[in-house]
């Protein structure tokens, strides 16, 4: 994706920018039916029990029937996936054409489901038949995995590493260099290193080619010790202060406005983040999600005034709301990398009469408490500036979801989400997402903080890597590893000239 058109590093990309898929093209053959045409030169790995046969439309039908309980003997959706329960049917039109039908949702809903991380992890029917049973529905032995991607799994040590070997029968070519068949790298190892300090030491020694999800401090330290390394940034999501909106005094919007106006976002961006953060408030979707958000630069002056730093105005609003001074507990994860930022927030709130008592919790316990809506104060969270598919963002304030730990019950918001889900065209969906961003900004359910950059570091000989999301790591695994890693390569001459021979 040309970054001048759309920020390719986000987890969400409009489907018109998708390339390198097993499907060559697709179209809406009906209001809620997608017809896809598959490549005719895609083969499963040349391992038993599939032995390198051609990938066909029947493989796609089997995968979705099994995943969502639509046929082939499967009557219930797999518990591991709920995103597409509305899918009604999948039909092989011919050997290389597949039709997907839904009962009546928007085209954007369909494409977000189809092109999201869960949209295409097809498994060979022969492998499922051979290695699963009614009591064990998934393949648990990595030796039995069969795919058709650019790399074959040749070793796996649980909790330590996965080794990948080039699939010489892979169909793909590099979109940037169309004559080059993929993948470039013959052998690749994905390491699982829980201690970041250990991982960074291995990077410094030239033992690891790339690492991402680094903090500003870690990136600064790496730049000081290894100035020749390539350093990259990509957009993160902002931290937020999340009040329980059904608990006084946060039921009064003036209190939430005051809490926003008490925070000096530009100063935090320039000092705490050393100028590497977006210094203005965020709305539901990331400010970098061009065409799908509501950037601060487009806000009217009246709305900006309820967000801009103004401690005097904040005190006046608190007094008008009958909350000139109050104390509240802020729950936060003890694993948060921004606890120092929380100390700054605590100080700025104290200046307007708000006492914040910080309660650190285990991350899992905190998540459980928030989803159960048992928090009675505020939380240090990440509820704005989402970088994933935009319709997912609505759910964080939808009345009926566990993601709504702010306890918002807003009929207008729920109705707007329903309209977005049912919008008949992409343009209408996009307009409703922008409208949702505007409405969220006006309600000020959450207090926004600057949007930081996330840092990645790679060796100078590691080419083709541009800190693409999910390309080398991820909390749920390297979701886009097959696509991106097949397009990376090693400049061996440069590597050897730097004294690295392995």
Language-model-derived ranges and their functions:
Residues 257, 269-272, 301-308, 355-366, ...:
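Extracytoplasmic/peripheral linker and loop segments enriched in polar/acidic and small residues
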Residues 282-293, 364-422, 465-469, 474-476, ...:
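Acidic-aromatic pocket-rim loops
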Residues 1-30, 146:
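N-terminal lobe/hinge region of extracytoplasmic solute-binding protein
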Residues 17, 22-74, 99-104, 199-202, ...:
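Aromatic- and charge-enriched surface segment that lines or borders ligand/interaction sites
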Residues 136-143, 169-221, 355-357:
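Ligand-site clamp/hinge motif
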Residues 151-152, 276-320, 334-340:
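Structural transition elements
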């Amino acid at each position: 994706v040309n970054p001048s058109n759309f920020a390719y590093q986000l987890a969400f990309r409009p489907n018109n920018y998708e390339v390198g898929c097993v499907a060559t093209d697709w179209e809406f053959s009906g209001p809620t039916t997608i017809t896809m045409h598959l490549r005719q030169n895609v083969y499963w790995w040349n391992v038993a029990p599939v032995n390198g046969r051609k990938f066909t439309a029947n493989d796609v039908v089997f995968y979705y029937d099994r995943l969502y309980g639509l046929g082939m003997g499967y009557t219930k959706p797999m518990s591991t996936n709920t995103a597409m329960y509305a899918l009604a049917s999948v039909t092989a039109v011919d050997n290389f054409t597949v039709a997907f039908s839904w009962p009546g949702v928007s085209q954007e809903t369909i494409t977000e489901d189809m092109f999201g991380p869960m949209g295409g992890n097809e498994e060979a029917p022969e492998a499922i038949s051979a290695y699963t049973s009614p009591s064990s529905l998934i393949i648990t032995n990595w030796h039995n995995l069969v795919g058709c991607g650019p790399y074959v799994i040749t070793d796996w040590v649980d909790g330590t590493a996965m080794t990948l070997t080039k699939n010489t029968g892979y169909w793909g070519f590099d979109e940037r260099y169309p004559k080059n068949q993929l993948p470039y790298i013959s052998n690749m190892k994905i390491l699982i290193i829980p201690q970041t300090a250990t991982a960074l030491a291995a990077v410094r020694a030239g033992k690891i080619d790339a690492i991402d999800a680094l903090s500003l401090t870690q990136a600064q330290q790496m730049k000081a010790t290894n100035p020749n390394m390539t350093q990259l940034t990509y957009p993160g999501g902002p931290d937020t202060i999340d009040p329980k909106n059904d608990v006084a005094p946060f039921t009064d919007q003036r209190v939430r406005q005051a809490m926003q106006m008490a925070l000096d976002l530009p100063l935090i961006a320039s000092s705490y983040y050393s100028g590497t953060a977006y210094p203005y408030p965020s709305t539901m979707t990331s400010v970098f999600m061009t065409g799908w958000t509501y950037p601060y630069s487009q806000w009217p002056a009246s709305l900006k005034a309820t967000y801009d730093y103004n401690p005097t105005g904040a005190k006046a609003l608190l007094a008008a709301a009958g909350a000139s001074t109050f104390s509240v507990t802020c729950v936060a994860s003890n694993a948060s990398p921004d606890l120092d930022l929380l100390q700054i927030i605590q100080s700025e709130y104290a200046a307007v009469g708000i006492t914040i008592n910080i309660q650190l919790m285990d991350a899992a316990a905190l998540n459980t408490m928030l989803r159960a809506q048992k928090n009675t104060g505020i939380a240090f969270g990440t509820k704005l500036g989402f970088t994933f598919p935009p319709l997912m963002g609505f759910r964080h304030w939808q009345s009926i979801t566990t993601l709504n730990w702010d306890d918002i019950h807003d009929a207008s918001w729920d109705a707007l989400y329903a309209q977005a889900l049912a919008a008949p065209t992409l343009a209408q969906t996009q307009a409703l997402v922008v409208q949702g961003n505007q409405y969220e900004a006006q309600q000020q359910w959450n207090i926004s903080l600057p949007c930081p950059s996330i840092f990645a570091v790679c060796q100078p000989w590691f080419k083709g890597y541009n800190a693409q999301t999910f390309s080398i790591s991820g909390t749920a695994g390297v979701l886009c590893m097959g696509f991106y890693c097949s397009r990376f390569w090693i400049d061996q001459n440069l590597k050897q000239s730097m004294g690295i021979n392995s």
